[in-house]
C-alpha cells in the first residue's frame, strides 16, 4: 500500500456483497456484545467469591505477607514503604526481564513481572506456573516448605490465579532436572513470594495459547482426540488486546518499528529532514472519490490521502530533501488482503539534479538497507513470526533490478498474458510478472519504471521521448506493488491543465499550485505503506496482521 497509489472502485456486485457482509457483521457484533455482557456478570460473581476465599486464606496463614493481591493504595504509587506487603517486599529491588533469566544467574534471587501463561497445580503442596513477559516465558515452581516460608495457602493462592493475570514473583533462579521444552528460558524460578497486580477474567474470549498456534499445529491436532481451537481473524481483531500478546504479534510490531527506525536512520544519514504535514485539507491530494470528507468550521474539507502536496511545497520552501512518517487516509471500499482505510505512510521528496533515476537510486539504497537491517538485527523476531506463519526469506539483490514498463509488458506477453500497453497492471498480472522476474533474475524485489501517463496522478512528469509515458515507477515485493514514485510536474500551468483533466477543482489546490509560481526546483519522490512492507517481507497473507488496530471498510473499533 504505497501512499501514492490509487485504487480502482469496486464493481457493483462486489459492493453489494460487502453491504450484505456489513449487515451480517453488525448482527454478529450485537450477538458478541450480548455474550460478553453475560460473561461479565458471571465474572463479577466469581470475583466476589474469589476475594472472599482469598481473605479466608490469609487470615489463617503465618506466611500471608508472602503472597496476595496488591491493594489499591499500593497501586497508587504510595511513597510509604509500609503501605502494604507488596511495597515492602519489592522495596529496594530491581525487576529483571524474563528474557534476561539465564544460567549465569543460578542461586540468585530475582524479582520478575509477567502474565500467568499457564497454571498447573499438581497437588496441594506443589504447583507450576509459566510466567510470560512479552514473548519470553519462564517456569515458576511453588513448593510448600517451612524453610522457604511457603505455606499450603500460598500454593492454593496460586491455583486461583487465572491465565493472563499480571503478577510479581520473587524467587531463586535454579536449573530444572530436565531441559524445558515449553518455555523460552532454560532456567526456572523457585517461588518465595508472589503478588497479583491485576487479575484477569477466569474465562477469556480467546486463549493466547490458541491464538499463537500455527496452522500446521492446528491441522495436526485435528487428527487427535483433543483438536486445537482455530481463532478466526474477526475474533482476533475484536479482542485485539489479547491477540497482540502472542509471540508472533509481539515480533511483528518489533519488526515494524525496525523498518521505521531504519527508514529514518538511512534518510538522516543522507541529509533528509523529517517533516509533519497537515492531515486536514481543503481539497483532495490525489483526486477521485476515495476521500473522507468532513466539515471544517463551515468549510468543506477532507482527510489527506497522502502528504503529497505539502511535501512538494516543502521542497519549494528550500528544504531540499524531506521525509515523513505519518497517517494516510483512503476512503476506499476495497475489502482485500492488502488494503486499509488508514495506514502509516513512509513518504520521501527530494530535489533532482538531472534525472528521475536519482529517486530510484535512493529507493534501491534505502530498501536494501532496510531489508539487510531486518535480517541482521531481528533474527529472533523473524524466527518468532516464522514459527507461527512459516515463510521463506525475501530474495533481493545488492543492486536492485530495474525494468521499464514496456519490458514488463513484453515479459508477460511472451508468457501468454495479454495486458494493455498503455494501461495499468492488475493484481494477477503483477503476481505473474513477479513470478517471471524471480525465475529469470532470482529476486523478489524490483523496480518497474516509465509507466503510462494515463494511469498516474496529475502531478506526474511526462517522459521527454514519449508523451504517452511518464517519469514514474512502482516497486514490487513478492509480486505485489509496494511503492509508487515519480518526478513531479513543477510548472504551474501544466499542473493546472493536468488537474483539470483529472477532475480536480483547481481552486481547492490553488495554494499548492501557487507555490510553483515563485521558482521551483526539479523534484520527485515516493511513498510506501509501512504495514505493507512488513506484510510482504514476512510473506503474511493479510495486512490486518501488521496493523496494530486496523481500519478497513467494515471496522472502526477497537
Swiss-Prot record:
GO cellular component terms attached to this protein's record: cytosol; endoplasmic reticulum; plasma membrane
Residues given in the record as L-aspartate binding sites: 286, 330, 484, 488
Stored Gene3D superfamilies: Bira Bifunctional Protein, Domain 2, Nucleic acid-binding proteins
Naturally occurring in which organism (per UniProt): Arabidopsis thaliana (Mouse-ear cress)
DNA-binding region: 110-195
Residues binding ATP: 330-332, 338-340, 481, 529-532
UniProt-recorded name of the protein: Aspartate--tRNA ligase 2, cytoplasmic
Presence of keyword Metal-binding: yes
Bias type Low complexity, positions: 1-18
InterPro entries given in the database record: Aa-tRNA-synt_II (IPR004364), aa-tRNA-synth_II (IPR006195), aa-tRNA-synth_II/BPL/LPL (IPR045864), Asp-tRNA_synthase_2 (IPR004523), Asp/Asn-tRNA-synth_IIb (IPR002312), NA-bd_OB-fold (IPR012340), NA-bd_OB_tRNA (IPR004365)
Any Pfam family the entry gives: tRNA_anti-codon
Binding site for Mg(2+) 2: 481, 484
SUPFAM superfamilies listed in its UniProt record: Class II aaRS and biotin synthetases, Nucleic acid-binding proteins
Region Disordered, annotated ranges: 1-57
Binding site for Mg(2+) 3: 481
Gene Ontology annotations of biological process type: aspartyl-tRNA aminoacylation; defense response to fungus
Keyword annotations from UniProtKB, A to Z: Acetylation, Aminoacyl-tRNA synthetase, ATP-binding, Cytoplasm, DNA-binding, Endoplasmic reticulum, Ligase, Magnesium, Metal-binding, Nucleotide-binding, Protein biosynthesis
Enzyme Commission numbers on file: 6.1.1.12
Biased composition (Basic and acidic residues): 20-50
Residues with PTM N-acetylserine: 2
Catalytic EC class: ligase
Region (Aspartate): 308-311
Amino acid at each position: 500500500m504505497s501512499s501514492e497509489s490509487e485504487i480502482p472502485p469496486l464493481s457493483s456486485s462486489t459492493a453489494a456483497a460487502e453491504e450484505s457482509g456489513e449487515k451480517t457483521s453488525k448482527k454478529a457484533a450485537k450477538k458478541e456484545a450480548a455474550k460478553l455482557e453475560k460473561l461479565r456478570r458471571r465474572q463479577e460473581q466469581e470475583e466476589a467469591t474469589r476475594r472472599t476465599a482469598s481473605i479466608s486464606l490469609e487470615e489463617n496463614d503465618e506466611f500471608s505477607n508472602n503472597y496476595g493481591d496488591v491493594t489499591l493504595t499500593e497501586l497508587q504509587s504510595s511513597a510509604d514503604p509500609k503501605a502494604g506487603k507488596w511495597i515492602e517486599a519489592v522495596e529496594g529491588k530491581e525487576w529483571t526481564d524474563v528474557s534476561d533469566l539465564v544460567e549465569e544467574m543460578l542461586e540468585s534471587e530475582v524479582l520478575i513481572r509477567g502474565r500467568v501463561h499457564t497454571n498447573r497445580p499438581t497437588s496441594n503442596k506443589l504447583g507450576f506456573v509459566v510466567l510470560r513477559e512479552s514473548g519470553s516465558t519462564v517456569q515458576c515452581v511453588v513448593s510448600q516448605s517451612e524453610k522457604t516460608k511457603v505455606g499450603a495457602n500460598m500454593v492454593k493462592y496460586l491455583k486461583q490465579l487465572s491465565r493472563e493475570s499480571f503478577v510479581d514473583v520473587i524467587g531463586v533462579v535454579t536449573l530444572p532436572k530436565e531441559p524445558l521444552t515449553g518455555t523460552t528460558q532454560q532456567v526456572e524460578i523457585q517461588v518465595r513470594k508472589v503478588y497479583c497486580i491485576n487479575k484477569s477474567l477466569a474465562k477469556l474470549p480467546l486463549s493466547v495459547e490458541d491464538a499463537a498456534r500455527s496452522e500446521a499445529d492446528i491441522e495436526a491436532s485435528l487428527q487427535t482426540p483433543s483438536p486445537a481451537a482455530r481463532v478466526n481473524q474477526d475474533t482476533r481483531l475484536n479482542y485485539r488486546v489479547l491477540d497482540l500478546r502472542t509471540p508472533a504479534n509481539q515480533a511483528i510490531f518489533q519488526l515494524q518499528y525496525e523498518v521505521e527506525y531504519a527508514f529514518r536512520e538511512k534518510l538522516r544519514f543522507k541529509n533528509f529532514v523529517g517533516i509533519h504535514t497537515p492531515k486536514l485539507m481543503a481539497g483532495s491530494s490525489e483526486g477521485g472519490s476515495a476521500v473522507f470528507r468532513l466539515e471544517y468550521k463551515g468549510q468543506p474539507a477532507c482527510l489527506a490521502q497522502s502528504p503529497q502536496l505539502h511535501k512538494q511545497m516543502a521542497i519549494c520552501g528550500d528544504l531540499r530533501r524531506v521525509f515523513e512518517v505519518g497517517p494516510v487516509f483512503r476512503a476506499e471500499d476495497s475489502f482485500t488482503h492488502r488494503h486499509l482505510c488508514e495506514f502509516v505512510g513512509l513518504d520521501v521528496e527530494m530535489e533532482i539534479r538531472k534525472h528521475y533515476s536519482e529517486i530510484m537510486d535512493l529507493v534501491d539504497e534505502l530498501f536494501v538497507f532496510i531489508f539487510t537491517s531486518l535480517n541482521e538485527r531481528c533474527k529472533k523476531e523473524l524466527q518468532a513470526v516464522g514459527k507461527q506463519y512459516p515463510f521463506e526469506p525475501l530474495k533481493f539483490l545488492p543492486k536492485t533490478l530495474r525494468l521499464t514498463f514496456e519490458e514488463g509488458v513484453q515479459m508477460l506477453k511472451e508468457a501468454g498474458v495479454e495486458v494493455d500497453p498503455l494501461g495499468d497492471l492488475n493484481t494477477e498480472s503483477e503476481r505473474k510478472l513477479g513470478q517471471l522476474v524471480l525465475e529469470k533474475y532470482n529476486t523478489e524485489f524490483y523496480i518497474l519504471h516509465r509507466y503510462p501517463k494515463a494511469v498516474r496522478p496529475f502531478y506526474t512528469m511526462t517522459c521527454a521521448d514519449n508523451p504517452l509515458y511518464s517519469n514514474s515507477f512502482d516497486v514490487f515485493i513478492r509480486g505485489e506493488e509496494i511503492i509508487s514514485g515519480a518526478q513531479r510536474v513543477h510548472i504551474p500551468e501544466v499542473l493546472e491543465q493536468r488537474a483539470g483533466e483529472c477532475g480536480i477543482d483547481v481552486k481547492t489546490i490553488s495554494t499548492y499550485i501557487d507555490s510553483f509560481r515563485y521558482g521551483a526546483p526539479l523534484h520527485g519522490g515516493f511513498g510506501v505503506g509501512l504495514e505493507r512492507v512488513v506484510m510482504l517481507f514476512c510473506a503474511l497473507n493479510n495486512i490486518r496482521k501488521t496493523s496494530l488496530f486496523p481500519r478497513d471498510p467494515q471496522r472502526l473499533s477497537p
